Every structure is written in structure tokens, then in C-alpha cells.
Amino acid sequence: MRRNFETFIEHGLAIERNRDAAMELLTISHSYDALAGADLVFEAAAEDLNVKHAIYAAVEAVVDADTPIASTTSSIPVDDLCAGMQHPERMLVAHPFQPVHIQPLVELVGGSCTAQSALERTYELLIALDRKVVRLKKSVPGFVVNRLAQAMFRESLYMIEQGVADAADIDLAVRYAVGMRYASIGLLEYFDDVGFDLEKAIAQTVYPDLCAVDSVQQIVQDGIAAGNTGRRAGLGLYDWSKKDDADYLRRKTAPFLNDIHWKLPE
């Protein structure tokens, strides 16, 4: 948290007094007893049901019966998370996105076990924290954001494999067309703007040629087999030894830093 504040200070979004005041509000404990009286509990453990279930049992032993427990999982359904709980109606998913301390979006997902009151209570708290909340009507693998992302990843990798364009040119198209457009208007707002009739004509031409595979592309399988798994390995779709990593990290956080307007403690 202190390191994250250094980024805010560097960009003129906070001063040292804000950092110090925020740190004073933070309590770190190794005991579940510290959760007694909590309004909401977030669980951000490894994606292992055994680990999560053990945590829920410990949390339920100290919090009120109606205190929501929100998992930050990106993949495990709520109905699997709540199995064996004393009060499964409290269980839900509140899935944030990296970098969590500055990315405003949270996906809020319930299951067949989840009480509407738990969802509403969590929603109200997230809104009070200036989050942008996507409320799913039902749970599906990948929720909303990762389904959209995987659709784009799949088509992008397919175009590389088919020799349509390379990674750099596809990223150029995303950054200066798709990304810029949908940063200020919604995808489906634009669909309505274009109109159903024109979108139908485009779809009839493009849909039959889109990637429809339901397995991981060979380019990914080959990269894993060779140890070329991306940025951390130094080689993936890009040769990262030829890229400015510090510049990449700055660009990765810049859009979110520009949107910060929090009232910070003093």
C-alpha cells in the first residue's frame, strides 16, 4: 500500500500526508478475530477451493450471520464457493481487475445460494468506495470482462496464425481504434449508433470467417512447450528484450491514474 501511494505522489495525485493518514487507518492482523464486527469480508486467496473453504469456515466463526463474504475469484462459480458454509446466502463474488488499487471496475456476481440483501449491501459499499460495478444477472464462466477479452484474444491469435497481421499491427488497431473509441462510449452504445441494419450486413460477411475453435491455439501451446510464455519469460508474441519495460508499465497504469478523483484522508 505504501508503494502504491508513491505512484500517486509521483503523479501529483497525493502528498505524503495523505499516505501517512491512510496507513494509520490500516490494521494488519494474523487473527481472524480481527474481523469481528466487519461490514463486509473480501477473500483474495489462491484459486483453490480447499483453501477458500477453510478460510470461509474461520471467517464465519467470528462475523455476524448476515455479513457478506465476497471472493475476488476470476473463475470459480459462487455455488462451488458456498458449498459447506453455515450461511451460504452470504457468499458472492466481487471480482476486481489489475491493478486493483487504481482500476475502478468490479464485477458483482451471485449464485443460487446468494441472498439479494448480500448483493445489495456489497453493491452499496462498492459504490461508496467510488467503484464502477457490473452486476451480472447470472454466473457464467469468465463473467463479463474475461469473456470479452478471451473473444478478442482468440480472434487476434487466429489472425496471427492465419498470416493476416502480426502482433504489433493488431495491437496498433486496438490501441488507436477499438481502445480509443470504447474508452469514452460503450460497445453496445456504438452498436446502436451504427444501427441493426448495417451491423447485420457486416455480420453476414464477417461472422462466417471468424475463429470458432474451442481449444487453445497452437501458437500458445508451442510457446509454452518452448518456455516462451510472454513478458516474464522475455519472449512471447513480442521479443521483450527489445522493448522498454519501464515504458510499458507506465502505459499500463496511465489511463487509470488519469481517472482518479478520490477524497484522500489527511
Identify what each model region corresponds to.
Residues M1-F5:
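Conserved phosphoryl-transfer catalytic core
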Residues Q150, I160-Q162:
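AAA+ ATPase "lid" subdomain C-terminal helix
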Residues R135-S139, Y158, L172, Y176:
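Short, flexible helix-loop junctions that flank or precede catalytic/ligand sites
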Residues P68-N146:
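Rossmann-fold dinucleotide-binding core
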Residues A128, A149-E155:
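Structural/interface elements that position substrates and couple domains in central-metabolism enzymes
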Residues S117, R131, Q162, A167-E266:
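NAD(P)-dependent Rossmann-like dehydrogenase/reductase catalytic/cofactor-binding core
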Residues I9-I69, I76:
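Rossmann-like NAD(P)-binding element
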